């Protein structure tokens, strides 16, 4: 610390950067500093801070002071805000729509509204009194510290860029931890970790802490996350069954009565495969190949399934591979498809033509008119054609010599 006593800034109207960190000040008059861009006043004894004239302020670091409240309504250009280690019990952030870094750890916050902060990339709200943390609008979030609160739920399904999470020291049950793991998006590619783990869910010094020892970390690790706590998956009477994305068909889960089990997240493309079922509950797999395809291989956690039912004990990932159905036969008289040694055309005025290679890859998918020729190299293909006017669809297997 470098004590300097009082600071007189009355004659500094053009000041853009002010660093008074660890100077021992208890008051700071910024009335005339209307051009200030960066303010570093951390590690002092400030109990109040008037920022009403600092419209252009972009960075504020006022951590480790004695602030019990702060008015940020004039600081509409703030991008970086650090108020850690104060005594704030509430804060209004609604005007700070450009914030990318927000650090509010070690305060007395019992709630926080982040709905107007879509640009946040780094969020530190650790060691507060939060029972709920709503993050659905923070789609740019990459780093989250929410450890040391009273959270019982944490949904991160809208955070595809998240790469560091510290959530230990909360009150999540084993089921809640599983829900958190399931909500995580796949770990971003190309990220180099600076720490041993990307997800800290427990801590030896935290009491109480999350029951991660009885949760199932596979739900997270299979997506590339490195979790600091092993779990035995024994603490929850429900398990997650994930149906991996498929091509040329789909898999649905159903209970014994044939009722389709709906995904937990029905509107998120990244999470459509997640289903929650009771442990030891027998479930059926409803297999629906696309027209012209059949199921080739069905696995659960890499092991081939011989039937169409299973009884999961912990997280289970279902993979299905569909192949061309060799039993598909061309119609006796085609009204839509014409074949020559050079390729395929349509007999309809307009048809949507889709051509698949023998390994199931889409080779061509375009509307064509009568007489237009789609040339094909030598090989075997599956062709579907839908006549736009008649609404008829034909499927035919084609061999180009």
Predicted regions, residues:
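Conserved "repeat-terminator" motif of extracellular CCP/Sushi domains
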Residues: 239-245, 308-327
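Surface-exposed interfaces of beta-sheet-rich extracellular modules
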Residues: 280-307
